[in-house]
Amino acid sequence: MKRTYQPHKKSRKTTHGFRSRMATKNGRRVLAARRRKGRASLTV
């Protein structure tokens, strides 16, 4: 059986990247929350 996680750089960036987060209101909420928490890495 094939495993669920089949990594690809492009799909990773397009779904979880900074630009895609900034594109939506909720994505910006995610970034704001991560900034508030003091995360070293905001996105991928």
Curated annotation (Swiss-Prot):
Pfam families: Ribosomal_L34. GO terms for molecular function: structural constituent of ribosome. One of its GO terms (biological process) is translation. Residues 1-26 are annotated as: Disordered. The keyword DNA-binding does not apply. It comes from the Bacteria. Keywords: Ribonucleoprotein, Ribosomal protein. Belongs to the bacterial ribosomal protein bL34 family. This is Large ribosomal subunit protein bL34. The lineage of its organism: Bacteria, Bacillati, Bacillota, Bacilli, Lactobacillales.
